[in-house]
């Protein structure tokens, strides 16, 4: 798979570039950005274009507006933060392809940046509309996609727009290339032993990824709510824990396939249980076989943390996707944070995928220790499932 990098494009001073970023950052109720990692990770591409004296028009979405202007999804806070990080003005458009954006784009000087308003304020974005994509393409003689987090979606600014650029005028940004390289190396040629740590609430969300990962890994650790479907499949009583009964057969098939392939398959051996799903719940520690009726498992227990820590100890490659428990509640955060510390301590390559997992790593204070933290939740999961992502396929040099 050959994809251009920005360094392969022939920029001249004054070249106009349409850059698709993923600035879908979390905001608090006052509209302040609570985590600017996605903005910071786009800086290498933006700075490279600035060094080449390009005129840069940036597009991004934020949240899920209903295809019309909605102040709470405006990119104004992003423009402010980006300007602060770059230490230069970022011009903010009032619309996407309307008169304000077009006028401001026409007046851009070399080394200036225009940020369009949220592309999802136009309903044609999510429909992958070719007419809208053509209008966007008129902002730049070059196109760069640096938005891994939306590259699994065939949207106008990600997929349709590439039809208006030949191979010499389109590329993946440095962040997107980094994401692709990490995940492809991980799946095609990992340094062994390769351990996957898979958590999160539901098996259904991770089923395809598990099936695709099994032949590639040496060991697999299952935690989070999805573990209870596997525990129930083994005949354990799981009380009121989250279980997808319709996937019990699939869980049995996955365990049988792991055995056939010689992949060691680990489930929690003890559980932190609660009498209700709430901060003020009563809490007990029990073995995985002894969850009483009326109680639900909300985190892995200390023995599971020790066991998983030993499994991770000699790993040369670790992929972590999905928390071990309801880490948003303090009482049920210990398992996730301790596994985060165990992974951070390991000497191998440590790749973290998925939004919740990235949040957990940051809250555990381990983000500096990880080799790579992906910016895409759904996109990284689809890569792990072995799917081709529309935004990446559209950049391939045919």
Curated annotation (Swiss-Prot):
UniProt EC number: 2.7.2.3
Sites where the protein binds substrate:
22-24, 38, 61-64, 120, 153
Which pathway does it serve? Carbohydrate degradation; glycolysis; pyruvate from D-glyceraldehyde 3-phosphate: step 2/5
Q: Name one GO molecular function term.
A: ADP binding
Q: InterPro entries recorded for this chain?
A: Phosphoglycerate_kinase, Phosphoglycerate_kinase_N, Phosphoglycerate_kinase_sf
Q: Name one GO cellular component term.
A: cytosol
- UniProt record, GO biological process: gluconeogenesis; glycolytic process
Its primary localisation, in coarse terms, equals: cytoplasm
The family line of this record is: Belongs to the phosphoglycerate kinase family.
The molecule here is called: Phosphoglycerate kinase
Q: Which organism is it from?
A: Nautilia profundicola (strain ATCC BAA-1463 / DSM 18972 / AmH)
């Amino acid at each position: 798979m050959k994809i251009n990098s920005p360094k392969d494009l022939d920029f001249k001073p004054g070249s106009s570039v349409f850059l698709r970023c993923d600035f879908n950052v979390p905001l608090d109720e006052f509209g302040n950005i609570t985590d600017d990692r996605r903005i910071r990770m786009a800086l290498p591409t933006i700075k490279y274009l600035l060094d080449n004296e390009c005129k840069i028009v940036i597009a991004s979405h934020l949240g899920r507006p209903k295809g019309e202007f909605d102040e709470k999804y405006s990119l104004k806070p992003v423009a402010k933060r980006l300007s602060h990080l770059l230490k230069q003005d970022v011009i903010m458009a009032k619309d996407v392809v309307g008169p304000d954006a077009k006028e401001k784009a026409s007046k851009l000087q070399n080394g200036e940046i225009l940020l369009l308003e949220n592309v999802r304020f136009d309903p044609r974005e999510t429909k992958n509309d070719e007419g809208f994509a053509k209008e966007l393409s008129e902002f730049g003689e070059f196109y760069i996609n640096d938005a891994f987090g939306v590259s699994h979606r065939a949207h106008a600014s990600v997929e349709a727009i590439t039809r208006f650029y030949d191979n010499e005028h389109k590329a993946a940004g440095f962040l997107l290339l980094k994401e692709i390289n990490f995940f492809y190396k991980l799946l095609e040629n990992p340094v062994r032993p390769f351990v996957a740590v898979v958590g999160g609430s539901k098996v259904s969300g991770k089923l395809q990824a598990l099936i695709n990962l099994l032949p590639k890994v040496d060991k697999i650790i299952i935690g989070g709510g999805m573990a209870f479907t596997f525990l129930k499949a083994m005949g354990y009583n799981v009380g009121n824990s989250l279980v997808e009964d319709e996937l019990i057969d699939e869980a049995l098939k996955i365990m049988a396939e792991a055995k056939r392939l010689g992949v060691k398959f680990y489930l929690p051996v003890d559980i932190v249980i609660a009498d209700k799903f709430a901060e003020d719940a009563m809490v007990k520690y029990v073995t995985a076989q002894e969850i009483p009726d009326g109680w639900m498992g909300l985190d892995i227990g200390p023995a599971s943390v020790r066991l998983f820590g030993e499994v991770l100890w000699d790993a040369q490659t670790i992929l972590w996707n999905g928390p071990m428990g309801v880490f948003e509640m303090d009482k049920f955060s210990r398992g996730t944070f301790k596994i985060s510390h165990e992974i951070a301590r390991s000497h191998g390559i440590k790749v973290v995928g998925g939004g919740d997992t990235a949040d957990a790593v940051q809250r555990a204070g381990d983000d500096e220790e990880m080799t790579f933290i992906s910016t895409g939740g759904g996109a990284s999961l689809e890569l792990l499932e072995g799917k081709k992502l529309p935004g990446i396929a559209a950049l391939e040099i045919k």
